[in-house]
Amino acid sequence: MARPDDEEGAAVAPGHPLAKGYLPLPRGAPVGKESVELQNGPKAGTFPVNGAPRDSLAAASGVLGGPQTPLAPEEETQARLLPAGAGAETPGAESSPLPLTALSPRRFVVLLIFSLYSLVNAFQWIQYSIISNVFEGFYGVTLLHIDWLSMVYMLAYVPLIFPATWLLDTRGLRLTALLGSGLNCLGAWIKCGSVQQHLFWVTMLGQCLCSVAQVFILGLPSRIASVWFGPKEVSTACATAVLGNQLGTAVGFLLPPVLVPNTQNDTNLLACNISTMFYGTSAVATLLFILTAIAFKEKPRYPPSQAQAALQDSPPEEYSYKKSIRNLFKNIPFVLLLITYGIMTGAFYSVSTLLNQMILTYYEGEEVNAGRIGLTLVVAGMVGSILCGLWLDYTKTYKQTTLIVYILSFIGMVIFTFTLDLRYIIIVFVTGGVLGFFMTGYLPLGFEFAVEITYPESEGTSSGLLNASAQIFGILFTLAQGKLTSDYGPKAGNIFLCVWMFIGIILTALIKSDLRRHNINIGITNVDVKAIPADSPTDQEPKTVMLSKQSESAI
């Protein structure tokens, strides 16, 4: 390819970034040592950039205002865009180093702590429903009362999501994490004082606090992944953060039937078993709150990706929470995703809440196996989540993957519905696992797809709205499916969910895939976001600009 010539005059069209004072730098130069070689000799005008001391600044000024000059000798002229302020300065001006991108080892600690206290919160959500008949007999209340111990998680989320996301956007990640972990711990201790048959209201109070804690937990996976992890691992990190919540649901399906067996004839033993479960949960929640206070940091020293560097460079006063909400609701693809995510996740919440009742309808006395089926459903979903996260990091095929998983979840729900009453419980284990693999595996897909199509809006806000939609659909689906199950049997309730999931497939197919964050990370910018050129050891190779006589005029 020909080198740039020495003709005077503007070689770049007005309005292009090169016309605003960008310097072409040799692609192979290491960070901090890039150089521009002027025309008057091999080292006549060479100067390092990226914050290092400069030589021949006057010569550098000539590059900006004078004739086009060739770069350092290379077979081809390959350059990446560097703001002129970083490479050439007026005499006496202070150097302005470029923002660096790097990965912090602490990111794994932050992810682990979050995943663990999210696990405990999810465990407390499902610990009543999976042994609903036991708590129904102990407290002397109806099944609807026990269902509300689960649905209060969904109910509390809807009105509190907006102040919670505002807090996350304005006060930061650490304070939000402390509130989530702290309220989770407090709610667990309150429930320890409810182990008497007339104190159902106390256990409801503790569960309400845990449900408020959930508001400060569910919106964090995509924010933690974006703030702490590089572009090649962000989807996997998000899936891992969601995995903690799913694992908590799995443990909630497994442990309560084992720790609190159905001993209605011995109330004292039953109370002792419930107390053991509550105190054990409180001890773990307390330990995790302490770890959160010690080790959970706001953000790493350096941004992990080009997209985060661009966001951190934006002036804070330009951010408006109300404007961000309006932008999200004007984004038609996001609105469609909001509905489809709510349908899928709401169906999962409903199935999880009513699983014990569905199983006991056809398999009397199988409380323990009902918990194991729930465990199978969630563990299979955990595998699905990780595989989907790895697949997204590798392919970036967000819409295609989301649509395929949605279709397979629908097929799994249909199979589960029509095999539940075959009287072979092993079949329910298999179909429950298939359903969980795709239905639970969908959860991180929705988060990451939302971040992609709404960038640069806050990840916490988009995730929070997705979760609010899930809670609303979860309440409606649980009430409707519970009523249908009581009046007509589990099959009627499950068919109700199948119809809604089919609608979700149609709406998912209509979503336009605009991967804004991914485009920033690979160097493609749009009018809304300015990418900051900074090297990262894990980022994709920076895009290059090939300069020649023909390409200069074509730009």
From Swiss-Prot:
GO biological process: blood vessel development; choline transport; embryonic digit morphogenesis; embryonic skeletal system morphogenesis; erythrocyte differentiation; erythrocyte maturation; head morphogenesis; heme biosynthetic process
Record-linked SUPFAM superfamilies: MFS general substrate transporter (SSF103473)
Record field: transmembrane: 100-124, 143-170, 173-192, 200-228, 234-259, 266-295, 332-362, 367-395, 398-420, 424-453, 462-487, 490-512
Region (Disordered): 1-52, 535-555
Phosphoserine modification, residue list: S56, S536
Sugar-modified residues: N265
Post-translational modification: N-Glycosylated.
Membrane topology, Extracellular segments: 125-142, 193-199, 260-265, 363-366, 421-423, 488-489
Source organism superkingdom: Eukaryota
Consequence the record notes for mutating W125A: Reduced transport of choline and ethanolamine
Binding site for ethanolamine: Q214, Q471
Membrane topology, Cytoplasmic segments: 1-99, 171-172, 229-233, 296-331, 396-397, 454-461, 513-555
Alphabetical list of Pfam families matching this protein: MFS_1 (PF07690)
Record's disease association: Retinopathy-sensory neuropathy syndrome: An autosomal recessive neurodegenerative syndrome beginning in infancy with areflexia and retinitis pigmentosa. Nyctalopia (night blindness) and peripheral visual field loss are usually evident during late childhood or teenage years, with subsequent progressive constriction of the visual fields and loss of central retinal function over time. A sensory ataxia caused by degeneration of the posterior columns of the spinal cord results in a loss of proprioceptive sensation that is clinically evident in the second decade of life and gradually progresses.
Protein name per UniProt: Choline/ethanolamine transporter FLVCR1
Organism: Homo sapiens
Name of the gene this protein is made from: FLVCR1
